[in-house]
Regions:
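A short acidic (Asp/Glu
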Residues: 9-12, 129-134, 206-207
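Short, polar/flexible loop-turn hinges at active-site or ligand-entry regions and domain interfaces
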Residues: 77-83, 142-147, 188-193, 217
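Conserved non-catalytic scaffold segment of RNase H-like nuclease domains
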Residues: 1-122, 194
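Short, solvent-exposed loop/turn segments at secondary-structure junctions
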Residues: 124-127, 163
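Substrate-recognition/cap helix-loop segment adjacent to the acidic, metal-dependent catalytic center
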Residues: 127-155
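Short alpha-helix plus adjacent loop in nuclease-associated cores
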Residues: 158-173
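A structural motif
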Residues: 171-183
């Protein structure tokens, strides 16, 4: 999953787009028709009045210009689209319902917190998961006992950036493991990059490639008693 946001600080920014796909952990492929995409009105605009391109809550940053450059439109179009987005609470409920429908049950199993989807994405531990916990606490899906969200698997997370770091750490020509650089190195088309729909599809494809690689190696490496 991936957020597009109105800022770079995960402790304060608001999401404006949230996209996701589901990867089948056994077939190692994107589940058919699992694509999900919603937009969310940012908190700064929820109660703002008289907002215009010359009078808005983002005058202290270039975030509107940045999103405009990514989408190839004027910043005023970005602002106007954000104003039209549905309330974050409603969009968040849709995402919760979406994840509920993808719990993984083993034979005879019951729905528990451990059957919930495993969160995965690029740099999610440092960024996206912090936003998830904030939204869960504000709108629903928060576990007070665990002090975190209850919509994803409580223990397991797969941050693709960490996988990339481990595999690419000793390749000198790779100077950065940003998603854009990794896309370029792997030969992934960057058209529409930084749109959440595009980013989650690319991340899912990269994750699947690494999972298949791990599966292939795991069957060939002698782990048992290897420290004896």
């Amino acid at each position: 999953f991936d957020f597009e946001t109105d800022g770079s600080d995960p402790t304060t920014c608001s999401p404006v787009q949230l996209s996701s796909v589901i990867v089948d952990p056994y077939k190692l492929e994107i589940v058919k028709d699992s694509e999900f995409n919603i937009y969310l009105k940012p908190e700064k605009l929820e109660k703002a009045k008289g907002v215009t391109i010359d009078n808005h809550p983002y005058t202290d940053s270039d975030i509107l210009e940045w999103h405009g450059k990514v989408k190839g439109v004027d910043k005023s179009e970005i602002l106007n689209s954000w104003l039209e987005y549905p309330d974050a609470k409603l969009s968040w409920k849709q995402f919760m319902d979406y994840l509920e429908s993808y719990h993984l049950f083993r034979s005879g199993g019951k729905k528990t917190k451990f059957s919930a989807p495993i969160a995965s994405g690029y740099n999610i531990i440092s960024f996206d998961m912090k936003i998830v916990d904030r939204l869960a606490k504000k709108y629903g899906g928060y576990d007070k006992k665990e002090k975190g969200n209850s919509i994803f698997h409580p223990r397991d997370k797969i941050d693709i950036m960490n996988l990339v770091y481990i595999w690419f750490r000793f390749i000198p020509e790779i100077k950065s493991i940003s998603l854009d650089n990794v896309r370029g190195y792997l030969g992934v088309d960057a058209t529409n990059a930084h749109d959440a729909v595009k980013d989650v599809k690319d991340c899912a494809d990269i994750l699947i490639r690494f999972l298949k690689l791990h599966k292939n190696f795991a069957s060939k490496v002698q782990f048992k008693d290897s420290f004896r």
